[in-house]
Amino acid sequence: HMPDAARVHYAYLDAGGIAPNVVQARATVRQLIRSPSLGGLSSLVERVRAIAEGAALMSGTRVTSRVFSAVSNLTENRPLSEAMQAEFEALGPVPFDAEDAVFASSIRESLSREDIADTFERLAMKPDYDMALCDFIAPLDRPFMGGMGSTDVGDVSWAVPTVQARVATCAVGTALHSWQQTAQGKAPAAHKGMLHAAKVMAATARRALTDPALIAAAKKAHESHLAEYPYTCPIPPETRPPVGEG
């Protein structure tokens, strides 16, 4: 048992051999462990280690493990988030055109209703199955509906006040790591979304540079978060890059 939002992915790097019905002399597996928070990640990693040790005990083998890489969860900075939301709303949604909508509609035909509904559910909104591209700005306050990505910006957010823009670049309902996302990666709509995100970021930076009160509030919020949730780097200090390893 583990939290619903946690994930444990794996891939066999070396199954030990091709003979069936034997305990192989060796095997290597890579585990990708994800949790919404650093504290949850730490306890889940220890649990996965305990499971591996239990499996080794049952099979009369030995197991060793090491961390190759890790990233922390992205922490919200409310003052910066509110500033970015205001700048985003002032700029408006991404200026997609009719040709963008036609291409996105062709992609949407390959998506399931569940994919499209999931996009709106994450925004706590009623699904619109006719919408090809996002023509609105998502509200700042919305419930966490699960699902997360991994980024080293997360660790940056524990070091300094950080805010991240989320801007539409593909058809509504497009799943991450899918061929549909790849197919749209260099489309004009994706380029427009990227440029719009840059404008939102630049406008937020301009506001921060010209508003000392915003900087002070962002720093205070960051310090308060660290006081309640101290930062511990998820990468052990003895970890070295796996240079030259297969």
Residue ranges, per PLM feature:
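Zn-dependent metallopeptidase/amidohydrolase metal-coordination segment
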Residues: 109-198, 216-246
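Short glycine/serine- and small hydrophobic-enriched flexible loop segments
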Residues: 202-210
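Short, flexible loop/turn segments with low-complexity composition
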Residues: 96-104, 213-223
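Hydrophobic, well-ordered secondary-structure elements that form the walls
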Residues: 84, 156, 201
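Midchain, well-structured core segments that form catalytic/ion-binding scaffolds
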Residues: 1-114
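C-terminal domain-closing interface element
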Residues: 32-40, 209, 237-246
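Phosphate-handling active-site elements
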Residues: 1-6, 210-216
